[in-house]
Design a protein with these regions (language model features):
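Short, well-ordered junction/capping motifs at the entry into regular secondary structure
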Residues: 1-2
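DE-rich acidic low-complexity regions and acidic surface loops
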Residues: 5, 9-328
């Protein structure tokens, strides 16, 4: 584990992760200066990305939709068009998985059934009491339960894995046609049959080892989810939980040029270390558990910078400062 060598003009970058009971926030420091701050709430058990083996509670033919019990106090909403084109294949696979408790059916050997008809109806596709695999696309708000899809996917930093699909599509934001062709060809050669992949913008220029490493992790998420379906004894049941808020935030902000990532919570420290080990094995040593007496943001001078940024006077690196006052 060697930190990237720095020249004289290079900036010392570190991330500081503050984990609190209701919130996790990540500060990015460049030479001790706070340059970015992101925070998200925690403990939302019905988070976007979570997958459930739910049960159809009520059909709503007028809306061409149904309500599904996923364990939330209010039933979740699933529209026919959100069942996804591959619903028939997924449904058949789930039935096989539930009926054979010893052996998992291999998705790579599954026969992909024709796409779901675009102008079909929920009443001809689902029945009350039926088990369905669903993923949350919109978290519950006030009087409404979560919004669902059955077009399930597993998102990583570079790739999104879509079971029962065979296409590889590359983010439109990658402009170079050579790079798009390279990524497409690369993914076609390493992905298993009957899995589709979306290549995200940040995959541009990445080596096969990094992409293959993440693909393996996403495939493992799928296997774990299917194993939970097979072992399910009660419905609804959670089969896949989107990565913790801290890892999710880090996934979008991570850069191998960071020299240290400091975390003040042991469980989150292990999650982040596992994630970094996975995508940049030679950088795993940069993740450090903070055990100091002072709150972590106080220790790194972040609290003071946050207060000054949100206060009346904002100081600049150059020595200038800005005074912000409400207009009377």
């Amino acid at each position: 584990d060697v930190a990237p060598s720095r020249g004289l003009g290079d900036v010392y970058k570190r991330q500081v992760v503050d984990v609190q009971p209701k919130e996790v926030s990540i500060a990015l420091l460049e030479d001790k200066q706070l340059v970015e701050l992101q925070s998200e709430g925690r403990n939302i058990s019905f988070s976007v990305g979570n997958m459930y083996l739910g049960r159809v509670k009520k059909l709503m033919p007028g809306l061409n939709a149904c309500f599904v019990d996923v364990g939330y106090e209010k039933d979740a909403f699933l529209h026919y068009l959100d069942l996804g084109p591959q619903f028939n294949s997924l449904e058949k696979y789930v039935k096989q998985t539930l009926s054979d408790k010893k052996k998992l059916p291999q998705i790579t050997k599954a026969t992909i059934l024709p796409d779901l008809e675009k102008d079909g109806t929920v009443a001809n596709t689902l029945k009350v009491g039926q088990e369905v695999v669903v993923q949350i696309v919109k978290e519950p708000i006030s009087t409404k339960g979560p919004r669902l899809t059955s077009e399930i996917s597993f998102a990583g930093r570079y790739l999104v894995l879509i079971p029962f699909n065979d296409k590889v599509s590359v983010s439109q934001k990658i402009k170079s046609s050579e790079e798009r062709a390279r990524l497409k060809q690369l993914l076609m050669s390493i992905k298993p049959k009957n899995f589709g992949v979306i290549v995200r913008t940040v995959a541009e220029g990445k080596r096969v080892a990094e992409l293959d490493g993440e693909l393996k992790v996403l495939l493992k998420h799928w296997e774990d989810a299917v194993t939970k379906i097979q072992k399910a004894t009660k419905f609804p049941t959670l089969i896949y939980e989107e990565t913790s808020r801290a890892v999710g935030l880090l996934r979008d902000l991570f850069n191998p040029s960071f020299e240290n990532i400091h975390v003040n919570d042991e469980a989150v420290f292990h999650e982040i270390k596992d994630y970094v080990t996975l995508i940049a094995p030679d950088r795993a040593g940069i993740v450090k558990l903070y055990k100091g007496q002072l709150p972590i943001y106080d220790n790194f001078g972040i609290t003071k910078q946050i207060k000054s940024s949100f206060g009346k006077t904002v100081s600049y690196k150059s020595g200038a400062y800005l005074i912000i006052e409400p207009v009377s």
